[in-house]
């Protein structure tokens, strides 16, 4: 079973200030010819992934299309957010679109979705792929998997989830704390 990657690329991505231009989101900043959106697109070229859904806004549409072409994606789906409403509505819209598409193709909803931020940098991608491969077999209709990292210090720029260990490296989320606005 292939995983449907959903790339969330609608945010302003401003946490690199003062190292970024005023009107350039973090995911589009060039780091030696390689942007964070390029790294994200490259990350989902493995055989375990289906073609991507990209959730973005009209402001980034041309840039997204350029990066998809640069990374040789022939099949993809772009969902335009009508206005900036944070992460949850973007996830919901993309999930509904993916389920609708899955139902049209397969007459049932069963393809797992993997939501990825367009502006993440990963140094140890093999751990990411291992976690997906390991957990894809544990999915069921009642649960979702959230991949996270242990914070090294408190920050008001990120949300947190509190967990309870169930087995091995699998924890149950007990509470999610959204970042303050």
Features from the language model and the residues they span:
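Conserved N-terminal catalytic core of the sugar/cofactor nucleotidyltransferase
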Residues: 1-7, 14-18, 22, 34-115, ...
């Amino acid at each position: 079973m292939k995983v449907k990657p959903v790339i969330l690329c609608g945010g302003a991505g401003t946490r690199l200030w003062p190292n970024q231009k005023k009107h350039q989101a973090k995911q589009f900043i060039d780091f030696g010819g390689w942007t964070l959106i390029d790294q994200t697109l490259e990350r989902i070229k493995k055989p375990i992934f289906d073609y991507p859904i990209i959730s973005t806004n009209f402001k980034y549409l041309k840039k997204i299309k350029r990066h998809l072409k640069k990374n040789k994606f022939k099949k993809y789906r772009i969902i335009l957010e009508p206005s900036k409403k944070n992460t949850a509505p973007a996830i919901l819209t993309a999930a509904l679109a993916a389920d609708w598409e899955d139902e049209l193709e397969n007459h049932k909803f069963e393809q797992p979705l993997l939501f990825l931020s367009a502006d993440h940098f990963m140094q140890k991608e093999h751990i990411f792929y291992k976690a997906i491969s390991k957990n894809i077999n544990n999915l069921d209709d009642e649960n979702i998997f959230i991949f996270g990292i242990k914070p090294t210090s408190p920050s008001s720029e990120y949300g947190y989830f509190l967990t309870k260990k169930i087995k091995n490296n699998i924890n149950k989320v007990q509470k999610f704390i959204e970042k303050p606005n």
